Amino acid sequence: KQTENLADTY
């Protein structure tokens, strides 16, 4: 779920 973490940064 690395993508989910990236979305949080945006």
From Swiss-Prot:
The keyword Methyltransferase does not apply. It comes from the Eukaryota. GO terms for biological process: defense response to fungus; killing of cells of another organism; negative regulation of cell population proliferation. Transmembrane segments: none annotated. Signal peptide: none annotated. Keywords: Antimicrobial, Fungicide, Plant defense. The keyword Repressor does not apply. Belongs to the DEFL family. Has strong antifungal activity against F.oxysporum, M.arachidicola and P.piricola, and weaker antifungal activity against B.cinerea, C.comatus and R.solani. Exerts antifungal activity against M.arachidicola with an IC(50) of 75 uM. Inhibits the proliferation of leukemia cells in vitro. Inhibits human immunodeficiency virus-1 (HIV-1) reverse transcriptase. Lacks mitogenic activity towards murine splenocytes. This is Defensin-like protein. It comes from Phaseolus coccineus (Scarlet runner bean). The lineage of its organism: Eukaryota, Viridiplantae, Streptophyta, Embryophyta, Tracheophyta.
